[in-house]
């Protein structure tokens, strides 16, 4: 996950941040080739795709000692992951960009509007994305507190999880 995060930051620093408007998305996708696609936040998508594996590993680690906490964490992480993946905007914007490029001038404003709707409801702006953040980061914070009460994880690991995921959890609300 750290590698995905570092790659995402590197892409942002080298190529620019993810586009903010539908017109910018369409321009970047149509004109910037691979660089345009890289700016669509696929690193975050890949990172979130790894969360179910972490959820299963945490469940396995705690299913004997704290079965209810393990199951709750598993459910929170899986629900959050599902919501986040279902609301990532990259594939929708790629599709709309292709339609926009082929559309007559009269139809292009409709496709720009459709693109703005996708942005407004994506994993960074929409209700499902908000809930995904609460479920995923809340699940990680919760299991980090559980780690404090077990001997299988060091206190440093638990506190690191609380701090890192706690900050990300707060980010959901800010």
Question: Would you name each region that the model predicts?
Answer:
Residues 1-174:
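Hydrophobic, aromatic-enriched alpha-helical segments typical of multi-pass transmembrane helices
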